[in-house]
């Protein structure tokens, strides 16, 4: 036989009147509204709110100290700012065209970030996309994807468009393309656990094809080097720099038979900046096309003839 039990409808089982303090009732003067954006607004005391804010500040300070002690964490923080559109940290290069970031190796050293921290990143040179180069001379893309006068700053813009962490080293040159400085280091890994943003680049070959397509859509013009971040940085440090988009330098003079771009970056050693530099060209020619050394003169040896009588 079923037994009916009368149940009290009042839910006061957890309430102890002895613990009630009328002075602790939350009022407009003592309450703070708290919400995490996912649920209803909670009322907490202002003292509790101040305690939580203080703990949050201490946690942020500890994270900042850890990032300063860890160069890779500092580098990753810069990459996060780049990918979120927050710009570059101060004293870490200049920003020119939208999507272009410039990092100089010396500035990384000043920030206690060594080149060894990103030595395993893929390196991309402009010569890989030069239409006037053969495969043996450094070209790495098919001829139909190659372009005229490729520049490192355009490669950096392409990597930024692809949301790839990249570093533009404006002074670095390829041994077979000494007149066209500028290379880009690219991180192709896609690991959210490491804070690396997702991307659609499959491998290095796919990356070269995407960069080549970007270069096809953004051909190099004579004013292109003077619209990039390197030129902006030079103007800031040297306002009397003679060349700009309206006053272009004379075209570089190469030794006969050399295949070199006609449009070069500002930092190219082939640009004389208005003055002929024959000594530099001679040194370059001797460095990359050394002359065959002549054999030392040999001393004449006197030959003695002896007659033998019969």
Curated annotation (Swiss-Prot):
GO BP terms: SRP-dependent cotranslational protein targeting to membrane, signal sequence recognition
UniProt subcellular location: Cytoplasm
Gene3D superfamilies xref list: Signal recognition particle, SRP19-like subunit
Known role: Signal-recognition-particle assembly has a crucial role in targeting secretory proteins to the rough endoplasmic reticulum membrane. It must be involved intimately in the translocation of a wide variety of protein substrates.
Biased segments, Basic and acidic residues type: 46-59
Gene: SEC65
Presence of the UniProt keyword RNA-binding in the record: yes
Domain of life: Eukaryota
Keyword annotations: Cytoplasm, Ribonucleoprotein, RNA-binding, Signal recognition particle
Family: Belongs to the SRP19 family.
GO MF annotations in UniProt: 7S RNA binding
Gene Ontology cellular-component annotations: signal recognition particle, endoplasmic reticulum targeting
Complex formation: Fungal signal recognition particle consists of a 7S RNA molecule (scR1) and at least six protein subunits: SRP72, SRP68, SRP54, SEC65, SRP21 and SRP14.
One Pfam entry name: SRP19
Composition-biased stretches (Low complexity): 60-73
Name the UniProt record assigns to this protein: Signal recognition particle SEC65 subunit
Record region (Disordered): 24-73
């Amino acid at each position: 036989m079923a037994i009916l039990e009368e149940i009290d409808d009042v839910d006061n089982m957890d309430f102890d009147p002895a613990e009630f303090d009328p002075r602790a009732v939350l009022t407009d003067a003592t309450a703070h509204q708290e919400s995490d954006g996912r649920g209803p607004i909670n009322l907490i005391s202002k003292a509790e709110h101040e305690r939580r804010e203080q703990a949050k500040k201490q946690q942020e300070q500890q994270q900042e100290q850890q990032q300063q002690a860890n160069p890779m964490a500092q580098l990753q923080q810069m990459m996060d700012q780049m990918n979120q559109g927050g710009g570059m940290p101060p004293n870490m290069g200049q920003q020119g065209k939208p999507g272009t970031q410039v990092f100089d190796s010396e500035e990384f050293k000043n920030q206690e970030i060594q080149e060894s921290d990103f030595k395993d990143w893929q390196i991309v040179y402009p010569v890989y996309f030069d239409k006037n180069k053969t495969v043996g001379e450094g070209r790495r893309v098919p001829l139909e994807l190659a372009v005229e006068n490729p520049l490192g700053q355009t490669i950096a813009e392409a990597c930024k468009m692809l949301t790839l962490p990249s570093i533009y080293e404006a002074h670095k040159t390829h041994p077979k393309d000494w007149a066209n400085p500028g290379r880009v280091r690219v991180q192709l890994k896609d690991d959210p656990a490491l804070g690396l943003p997702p991307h659609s680049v499959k491998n290095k070959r796919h990356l070269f094809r995407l960069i080549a397509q970007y270069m096809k859509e953004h051909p190099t013009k004579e004013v292109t080097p003077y619209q990039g971040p390197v030129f902006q940085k030079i103007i800031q440090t040297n306002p009397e720099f003679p060349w700009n988009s309206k006053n272009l330098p004379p075209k570089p003079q190469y030794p006969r038979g050399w295949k070199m771009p006609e449009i070069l970056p500002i930092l190219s050693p082939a640009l004389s900046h208005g003055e002929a530099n024959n000594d530099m060209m001679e040194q370059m020619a001797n460095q990359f096309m050394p002359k065959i050394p002549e054999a030392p003169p040999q001393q004449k040896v006197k030959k003695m003839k002896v007659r033998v009588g019969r």
